[in-house]
Swiss-Prot record:
Catalyzes the reversible phosphorylation of UMP to UDP. Signal peptide: none annotated. The lineage of its organism: Bacteria, Pseudomonadati, Pseudomonadota, Betaproteobacteria, Burkholderiales. The keyword DNA repair does not apply. This is Uridylate kinase.
Amino acid sequence: MSNAYKRVLLKLSGEALMGDDAFGINRATIERMVADIAEVVRLGTQLAVVIGGGNIFRGVAGGAAGMDRATADYMGMLATMMNALALQDAMRHAGIEARVQSALRMDQVVEPYIRPRAIRQLEEGKVVIFAAGTGNPFFTTDTAAALRGSEVGAEVVLKATKVDGVYSADPKKDPSATRYSSISFDEAIGRNLQVMDATAFALCRDQKLPIRVFSINKPGALKRIVQGEDEGTLVHV
């Protein structure tokens, strides 16, 4: 089966790395994610990753607790750096060559984000992990995913979540909620469906960059998406 996508941007939340733990990085969980990523890489699809930091620190929470919001956001960016290094290490153990590029310079640890270099590394078959969000406070890692996906020419943003798509209502609260197989950006806005934060969502819509929302906990889901199967929810123009 041929791949539906040549280049994709995978958005992983920091919380996804916790597994069943209350905090931090669950090694078994990250190894399972890397096994799914390895399948996609071996199929020949170029894969970039934007990773969050909510399993370690959330800037929004810090700001709400009285901390200076910009300072809290920078702390959140450093949390994404820790997650990116953990993901790179797990990939190395799985035989996948990965590079971490950071929006904040930390040259002794990771490479700075340089767009042409990132594209070249993707073309060479390496996984590129983007850390530190956009490098600016007040922007989420969802926005970083939309931005980096647009910059490197990804054909789709794959948003990995704990639910298997976009629903008409919260399925945990409403048993009658139905999952959308596909929905347009305008429909999602009109129905107030929280696919991503507004800035990220608007950027994807304006760049005509579709979003595929799927469950990171569903085995083989990432591979099925890359092969063009109907998995999760496609948000399109």
